[in-house]
Amino acid sequence: MSSTTAFRQGIYQFDWARRVVRWLDAMPNAALAVEVAPDRVAAARWSRTGSLDGYAVESLPVGALAPSAVEANIVNGAAVKAAVTNVCNHLDSQDEDVAMILPDTVIRVFVQHFEDFPRSAAEAVPMLRWKLKKSVPFEADETLISYMRQAPRETGIDVVTALARLRIIREYESLVEGIGLHPGVVLSSSLAAIALVEDEKPTLLARVSGSTLTTAIVRRGVLCGYRCTELPAHGVNLKPQMLLEEIFPVAAYYQDTWQEAIQSVRVAGLGTRLAEFVRPLEEEFHCDVRSLLHSAVSDGRIKEDARPLAERDLEGLIGWMLQRG
């Protein structure tokens, strides 16, 4: 299936109660997933019973990949292609479907409220294009769009819309097509990782990847807020207050819109520095703050065979594993 078909005919299926995030109408079933991140390429394969068959990780040289929704992403084509080839060869991948997990920056996600929303895609897609045309710096004919109606509220309905630039998605798809694989499902890393969030109460996910922060709020099967931003600093230079300032707009929006407080915070991507951020987050939100992966392991949502992925901080791949079944 082409990128255009996948985005335009597919529906962004956010059935959080069953932990499903996918681009396509069909239930995701690819046994192989490849995640491309600024610093590495990782791949994993699962058996028919859902257990981890194997995984591989290859580091990328600094600057080999520059995630962007607008400009070319692959800077060092030889290095990125070699990394993708190596991880796929390690898993004996050939002539099969593959799910692609991409940097959050590549796919723009919006949560919008409508008093009334068309039931047919023929009416909905043009309306969404018109409403969001000023939110993306590329032309409509270059835009891949997918959307999903969420559970209705007392008045109106919330719709999740995802936009991406066709030629950017094609950059990533060509990486696996070049070695005989068939890209189908395409999603961003944090949307895959949200499958690890327990959502019985309003939970905020703050996920750092390089210089990017993705903040999402999930509540009882509904994606209530989402924001992907560039941090003013990263690595050892990132300070708790910097993180809080970028998280605050999403948290404030949720509290104003839903009239309730955040009751749980999960954090990913800070590694050994997590402890520095826990106290400031607890003081701000007055709730439990924990590592996304550690909480998922302790709560039993990550099976024993997938622990190696957790140890490598591959929450995007683990999230895909949960989504596929």
Predicted regions and their residues:
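Hydrophobic/aromatic-enriched cytosolic interaction surfaces used to assemble or bind macromolecules
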Residues: M1-G325
